[in-house]
A protein has these predicted regions:
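C-terminal cap of thioredoxin/glutaredoxin-like
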Residues: 6, 10, 18-26, 109-220
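Short, cysteine/histidine-rich loop/knuckle motifs that typically chelate Zn2+
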Residues: 13
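Structural alpha/beta surface segment adjacent to cysteine/selenocysteine redox centers
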Residues: 16-114, 211-217
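Extreme N-terminal starter segment of soluble prokaryotic enzymes
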Residues: 1-4
Length: 220
């Protein structure tokens, strides 16, 4: 079984979902494969001002009962034809073996807690390189973040996100070997996902048990 997490590094709702994501990975370690992919936001999805960003942060922070408010200091208007760098840098870090959460979490924390300008390539690269240490050289990381290969991967994962007929991040797509699929878009609470994962694992186990007793279905 696999769970794919679609995210945007600068998304506040993705920030709030991280404790739940960490709990899922710990609870189902060894039984479920976990992966994350970038789902780019559309131009109209971004806040248009820092004041508007703060309003969104007050809303999401209140909903999740956070004891702190996120920092909008990272905000800069997204210019036409450009995209904030943080997600590209996080994706590029995968090329250096950082396929876990550590680099994108460092970027998210720097932006949404410290207010650093993670939309700027040089800032995002510096933060990621510090988080990755000697295994993540800044010059090579920057080249990868600007590469056509990374852009193509992000475009492909974004297309996959929209192919599920969803628009809200975070999104979680659950799939298993017997063809079941569950899609959650915009939820940050643990319980709906654990209920679905438990049900799907139980079904897979039942199919496995049946096959051990009866084999494959007759050809005719």
């Amino acid at each position: 079984m696999k769970v794919t997490y679609f995210l945007e590094v600068t998304s506040s709702w993705c920030f709030w979902s991280e404790p739940m994501w960490a709990e899922l990975k710990a609870r189902y370690a060894g039984r479920v494969a976990f992966d994350w992919e970038i789902a780019k936001m559309l131009p109209g999805d971004w806040p248009v001002s820092r004041a508007q960003c703060d309003w969104f942060y007050r809303r999401s922070g209140t909903i999740v009962r956070s004891p702190f408010m996120l920092n909008s200091g990272w905000f800069e208007p997204v210019k036409p034809g450009t995209y904030p760098a943080a997600s590209y840098v996080a994706e590029a870090a995968k090329d250096f073996g950082f396929t876990g959460d550590e680099i994108r979490l460092a970027l998210s924390h720097a932006g949404e807690r410290e207010g650093q300008k993670i939309g700027r390539l040089e800032v995002a690269v510096a933060i990621a390189a510090q988080a990755g240490g000697k295994k993540l050289p800044a010059k090579k990381l920057r080249a990868a973040a600007e590469s056509k290969a990374v852009a193509a991967r992000i475009d492909a994962s974004t297309q996959e996100f929209f192919a599920h007929q969803i628009s809200q991040r975070p999104a979680f797509v659950l799939s298993d070997d017997i063809g079941d699929k569950a899609v959650f878009s915009g939820l940050v609470h643990l319980e709906p996902l654990t209920a679905a994962i438990d049900a799907m694992l139980a079904d897979v186990a039942a199919y496995t048990s049946f096959k051990s007793h009866h084999g494959n279905p007759p050809a005719r």
